[in-house]
Curated annotation (Swiss-Prot):
Residues bound to sn-glycerol 3-phosphate: K108, G136, K191, D244, S254, R255, N256
Family: Belongs to the NAD-dependent glycerol-3-phosphate dehydrogenase family.
Pathway participation: Membrane lipid metabolism; glycerophospholipid metabolism
Highest taxon, organism lineage: Bacteria
Enzyme Commission number(s) of this protein: 1.1.1.94
Gene that encodes it: gpsA
Enzyme kind, highest EC tier: oxidoreductase
Record keyword Metal-binding present: no
Species whose genome carries this gene: Azotobacter vinelandii (strain DJ / ATCC BAA-1303)
Subcellular location: Cytoplasm
Name the UniProt record assigns to this protein: Glycerol-3-phosphate dehydrogenase [NAD(P)+]
Cited PANTHER family: GLYCEROL-3-PHOSPHATE DEHYDROGENASE, GLYCEROL-3-PHOSPHATE DEHYDROGENASE [NAD(+)] 2, CHLOROPLASTIC
MF-aspect GO terms: glycerol-3-phosphate dehydrogenase [NAD(P)+] activity; NAD binding
Keyword terms of this UniProt record: Cytoplasm, Lipid biosynthesis, Lipid metabolism, NAD, NADP, Nucleotide-binding, Oxidoreductase, Phospholipid biosynthesis, Phospholipid metabolism
Amino acid sequence: MIARQPIAVLGGGSFGTALANLLAENGHVVRLWMRDPEQAEAIRTRRENPRYLKGVRVLPGIEPVTDLAATVSASELIFVVLPSSALRQVLQPVSALLDGKMLVSTTKGIEAQSFKLMSQIIEEIAPRARIGVLSGPNLAREIAEHALTASVIASEDEALCQAVQAVLHGRTFRVYASGDRFGVELGGALKNVYAIMAGMAASLGMGENTKSMLITRALAEMTRFAARLGANPMTFLGLAGVGDLIVTCTSPKSRNYQVGHALGQGLALEEAVARLGEVAEGVNTLRVLKAKAEELGVYMPLVAGLHAILFEGRTLAQVIEALMTGEPKTDVDFISTSGF
């Protein structure tokens, strides 16, 4: 069925464009939906996304479109590549058209008011849809430039996982499957917060030992928090956990890392986000994550420290000093070691 129908990609940003190219390379007809008619026309005529993925050719099998209802009606497989703040606004008006469709979320964010992940919001909007999550260490430009990449498709629906693997798997892109949709999606959302701190540390010239400490303790915090919410902690040792955390916290191509780097150079938060020109989900996630951690009583000193830097006037040096002088804790305390 999918081979005879266009595949829809909702969102014309850098990742949506890179994902559309992957699908087109594998011989699929792709409808790349975006709200901005001028952007759609620019891609249609120039065969490039000049705003978000300049210099990367948009393949002929991709049709930029702006009619959302027609796009979702014509497709059985729909990749949702929208900013978290826009997801409800975009999908709610076409909810009646989504029954039975395969909806795959790629957005790594958390809704502020409800603390819902994106696939949970999609499930609320389209309760009869088949839902999955695509996540992992997937920098859009590297995918577009054919760097060897692996990702995870997570869903309780095995047939959906197999369908996504079939359409995306190629010579430079490998897709693994997981049944832990919640854990995979949570890992993708949480790591954005720590990438901001990693970017700041790099900007301030902190050493490799420091960067390694931040990444490792970030993994401990993420996993501790996820386990408290009922996710499988072992998921965080895979591509969607430590894999995504490493690439996001070490690459200047990461949007959240770029925001942190700009903050380390002395820019205000608003200036750093404006310089980026795209959405950095980590800023929004940080606010809700700190509140949720306090509500649940989960120990997350890096989250509290970054919140103090961004919103309470503290410096990174002050936060790191507080971390270093705090009471010593157990290293790996989020996975039971009984039986080892």
